[in-house]
Amino acid sequence: MQQFTVATARPLPVIILADVSGSMTQDDNIGALNAALKDLLSTLSKESRLNAEIQVSIITFGGIKAEVHVPLTPAWQINQTSDLVASGGTPMGGAFELALEMIENKEIIPSRAYKPTIVLISDGVPTDNWETSFNKLKNSDRAQKASRMAMAIGAGADKNMLKAFVNDLEASEVFEAHNAKEIHRFFRAVSMSVSSRSQSNTPNQLPTVDFSKLPDDELDLSDF
């Protein structure tokens, strides 16, 4: 009797690097970020897994260190996450190191996975040696293939640093957010980009994101 092998969807990793420093309490930006992340996870969990399985990890950096808040997990399996809590400094370099470790670990992200998307959110200036860690990330054989997007929250964000983080594979600019609605719009762009890739026959071909053309007439800010 002939046996058939059922093909499994290839992972499409999305790694979110979230600033949870003390300054994120200003204007309740941390609350807006929590609500936007929940909306993102809810949307991605509903995507088809025929071609690609979207997997999400959240790495936070605040206090004195970075840590993995949500390990890389299929989006449809993430039922709920604890809210991010803001405090302390901005150890962004530590987040880059954790992201690099995750991408280089083939038990976490196998060779058959599609190119990762790394999303950086920050409202301030890094308080550690971020340059060394970032150079390792962008020069790594595996990590350099990732698409990198960034959002600056408020006037205090280090926009030059964030511009250095962004590459030209997917979104060629830093999105600037000054309120909850704009934070939400950025994550809608992330969701649209990742969803588009997961439904494509060529998920490694990265779409262009034009932040100026994002619709905002359907936003529900009741959770903010």
Task: Give residue ranges: language-model regions.
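Von Willebrand factor
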Residues: 6-69, 79-114, 117-121, 127-129, 147-161, ...
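Short glycine-/polar-rich loops that comprise or flank the Walker A/P-loop
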Residues: 11-12, 144-147, 169-172
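Arginine/glycine-rich "motif VI" loop of SF2 helicases in the C-terminal RecA-like domain
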Residues: 48-49, 110, 138-146
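Short beta-strand-loop
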Residues: 52-82, 159-167
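Extended acidic, low-complexity intrinsically disordered regions
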Residues: 154, 204-224
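Von Willebrand factor A/integrin I-like adhesion domains
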Residues: 155-208
